Amino acid sequence: IPGLKAGTYNLTVTTNSGTITKENIKVYEYDRSGYAHYDAHKEGVTGIGAYNDDGTLKSNAVVVYVTEENKNTVQLPGYTGSQYPAGIGNILNYKSEDANGVTGGGKIDIVQQLRAEGIPLDVRFVGKIRGGDSNTSNNPPAENIKGLTGYNTTTNGGTKGDNGMMIRVYKSSNVTIEGIGDDATLDGWGIQIISQTGYISQGFEFRNLNFTNTPEDAIGLEGTCAISSSPQTKEWFESNGYAPIKFSWVHNNTFHQGFCKNPAESD
């Protein structure tokens, strides 16, 4: 049960079949003594991703649940309608063709809008969500995740020579990507957080997820760098293209073997 402080709780679940109550459920807190929180606290930042340091959800966070059934149709609560992207790939990757207007008619870059408004995003995956195509998988899903980078192409922000099947999240901050239950699985695809010049991205959390059959990275954290032949100040780097990913917390995930049916690259 995400979003609870450490303590003891009674839980009641009511369904069409009846009601069941479980008492004295103990909730333990995560260890938040690592560098993601240590460095954040030094800069006056509290709470990594969509959660506060006590484990509760930030009061203004937007939460979206993603399943295999709704992976290409879901929209963020409060951000629905034809002007907003639909599907988790198009929501997170503004370079996807269905989000940036190449074929989708032009959508609002919702991730950057949330960043500008100071609204955290919590993406909760339920069950197995499958991605991939005939180039990367021996058993691709009936419908690939729209918005994934293309295989060996620049489609949806991809790179020639890459195996693709990545959601590339640009210029964002305060995002939690998490699994609900012990079977939340990203099968055949991965997520990459990317900073760009002038947009230092910070505050990312990946937790309670299984990754399997990933043809590229399962999780990627990619900043930009600046090069100088002589020592420079921190301010120089920040004004000359240096944009790191800051305060990233990757924990309690399981990484299974990756797979690509027909690798487009040799590394």
What are these regions (language model features)?
Residues 1-124, 128-163:
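Extracellular "leader-to-stem" segments immediately downstream of a signal peptide or signal-anchor
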